[in-house]
């Protein structure tokens, strides 16, 4: 992916290019690079749905610091952040990956196999709400997940939050992606925006306001990629 198409909030193209070329691309795993390039080739503009390289590196380091072994990912697309997660987990690590679009995920499967991490991934073709409710109803997964990555339908982020707080352990982390939504959350309602920006902006502003006052989590809102809200479960 070219620096000009980097999905982030850095408005200076030169600064984005510097960040990627100096620190991110040199550290990118070979199979992640291959997946990124294959996604751009096949999905063109929609390749922006994958997390950028610097965010993938951040998630990888965070998981290693946490010694995470069991995670869930809501919203997979072609699997860039999923592969980054799988590479960061130990050999016996497990990821529940949920997305209704299995076709896009197939773009990433060859790279996941080449990286030798396919055994860590349980891909479920479904909407996320159904899977979360099933996991809670089953009872075996409550409070067992170390980490959750949410990069799915924005209108359900608050609903996912309530369910994930039952599944993620105390001290575990939920990461919400796209929380700055191309910078639109800081614009006024009267400013000109694309339809998708305006629609997502409403849901993400509600989420950000809610998370800031949720006593059940410790919050760190990062201006990496398109914005990432990290929530550590307190109780």
UniProtKB/Swiss-Prot annotation:
Top-level EC class as recorded in UniProt: transferase
Keywords from the UniProt entry: Cytoplasm, Metal-binding, Methyltransferase, S-adenosyl-L-methionine, Transferase
Pfam families linked to this entry: Methyltransf_3
GO molecular function annotation: metal ion binding; O-methyltransferase activity
Gene3D superfamilies assigned to the protein according to its UniProt record, in alphabetical order: Vaccinia Virus protein VP39
Binding residues for a divalent metal cation: 151, 177-178
Annotated pathway: Pigment biosynthesis; anthocyanin biosynthesis
Cell location: Cytoplasm
Variation of activity with pH: Optimum pH is 8.0-8.8.
Catalysed reactions listed for this entry: S-adenosyl-L-methionine + a 3'-hydroxyflavonoid = S-adenosyl-L-homocysteine + a 3'-methoxyflavonoid; S-adenosyl-L-methionine + a 5'-hydroxy-3'-methoxyflavonoid = S-adenosyl-L-homocysteine + a 3',5'-dimethoxyflavonoid
InterPro entries: Cation-dep_OMT (IPR050362), EF_Hand_1_Ca_BS (IPR018247), SAM-dependent_MTases_sf (IPR029063), SAM_O-MeTrfase (IPR002935)
EC number: 2.1.1.267
SUPFAM superfamilies found in the cross-reference section: S-adenosyl-L-methionine-dependent methyltransferases (SSF53335)
Domain of life: Eukaryota
Biological process annotations from GO: anthocyanin-containing compound biosynthetic process; cyanidin 3-O-glucoside biosynthetic process; delphinidin 3-O-glucoside biosynthetic process; methylation; pigmentation
CDD domains from the UniProt entry: AdoMet_MTases
Entry note: thermal dependence: Optimum temperature is 49 degrees Celsius.
Principal location listed in the UniProt entry: cytoplasm
A Gene Ontology term for the protein's cellular component: cytoplasm
Cofactor(s), names only, from the UniProt record: a divalent metal cation
Annotated S-adenosyl-L-methionine binding sites: 51, 73, 75-76, 81, 99, 128, 153
UniProt function note: Mediates O-methylation of anthocyanins. Anthocyanins are major pigments in grapes: at ripening initiation in red grapevine berries, the exocarp turns color from green to red and then to purple due to the accumulation and extent of methylation of anthocyanins. Catalyzes both 3' and 5' O-methylation of anthocyanins, with a preference for glycosylated substrates. Active on both anthocyanins and flavonols in vitro. Most active with delphinidin 3-glucoside but also acts on cyanidin 3-glucoside, cyanidin, myricetin, quercetin and quercetin 3-glucoside.
Record family assignment: Belongs to the class I-like SAM-binding methyltransferase superfamily. Cation-dependent O-methyltransferase family. CCoAMT subfamily.
UniProt-recorded name of the protein: Flavonoid 3',5'-methyltransferase
Upper lineage: Eukaryota, Viridiplantae, Streptophyta, Embryophyta, Tracheophyta
